[in-house]
Amino acid sequence: MSSERDIWITEVALRDGSHAINHQYTVEQVVSVAQALDEANVPYIEVSHGDGLAGSSLQYGLSRTDEMELIEAAVSVCKKAKIAVLLLPGIGTIRELDAAAKRGVKMVRIATHVTEADISAQHITRAKELGLEAVGFLMMSHMASTEKLVEQAKLMESYGADVVYVVDSAGALLPHEVTERIRALKQSLGIEIGFHGHNNLSLAMANTLAAIQEGATRIDGSVRCLGAGAGNTQTEVLVAVLDRIGLKTGVDLYKMMDLAEEIVAPILQVPQEITRDSLILGYAGVYSSFRLHAERAAKRFGVDSRDILVELGKRKVVGGQEDMIIDIAAEIASKKTATGAR
């Protein structure tokens, strides 16, 4: 396929997909996936803990392998693709950013809650000092008005971001909402716009196409839909759809299909599908990585995981507040016991 691109895809299976396998990636798995992605001519490959650099912890989930080892492994086998990392200020620090840059990372995505772009300034500034491509990543974008989103995106642009993303962390946005947000950003910013979707309402592809139609040129995908919740926009399908539309990605479709079937599918612990819990994530507007945490808490306290997720949505809990899952599960169990005792 031509190396010319209308759409630049970032493959997130080695970062967002980490959530789906409880952060258990091995060096061997990362090498095999990254090498195949590079051979398929995917331009960007994101590698890090599911919650970004330094995410390995009791709160977010312990990594099987140190993420710096995984980053080094991916860099070592990629001849064309650029390795990217995710960094959430407050979890990852400048120290981790510097360490990743030393290991050959070329792009960092600085992720904040959609209303907290101001905390990205230091990290975006440092990324540019290191010569990295800096991306502003506005998570849980469904939780802010379009006007607020534009305001926050402008802040990231002012700090030096090369790209700003609308990030549908909960898979809660509907296509017309994506259209409105991307259109407003395109009219208000002078930098590229990106979109990151989740498939909890079976709308990842529709939302991605809506974003592209309004001018988004940076798009996230996950091979075999390997990501938090019900996964992300499925990369190999996205490449096929965009080819049908006539938009160039530069990605080899057959190689992506083979990678999905032969390398990634065996890594999946269970098939990526829209389960009742992932559906509730999109319905209630809850951070997609909360699904497995909620399932474990539900089992521990003998309650329905859906009740936990719905309550999380009501309280507008955001990424970084995983400890609330246990608190809410305990509250529901306590109320259940009290009701049963009457």
Curated annotation (Swiss-Prot):
Single GO BP term: catabolic process
Top-level taxon in the UniProt lineage: Bacteria
Presence of the UniProt keyword Metal-binding in the record: yes
Active-site residues, Swiss-Prot/TrEMBL: 19
Pfam family name, one: HMGL-like
Positions bound to Mn(2+): 16, 196, 198
EC numbers on record: 4.1.3.39
Principal EC category: lyase
Keywords: Aromatic hydrocarbons catabolism, Lyase, Manganese, Metal-binding
A Gene Ontology molecular function term of the record: 4-hydroxy-2-oxovalerate aldolase activity
Residues involved in substrate binding: 15-16, 169, 196, 287
Catalyzed reaction equations: (S)-4-hydroxy-2-oxopentanoate = acetaldehyde + pyruvate
Sequence ranges assigned to domain Pyruvate carboxyltransferase in this UniProt record: 7-257
NCBIfam families: 4OH_2_O_val_ald, PRK08195.1
Family statement drawn from the similarity comment of this UniProt entry: Belongs to the 4-hydroxy-2-oxovalerate aldolase family.
Annotated protein name in UniProt: 4-hydroxy-2-oxovalerate aldolase
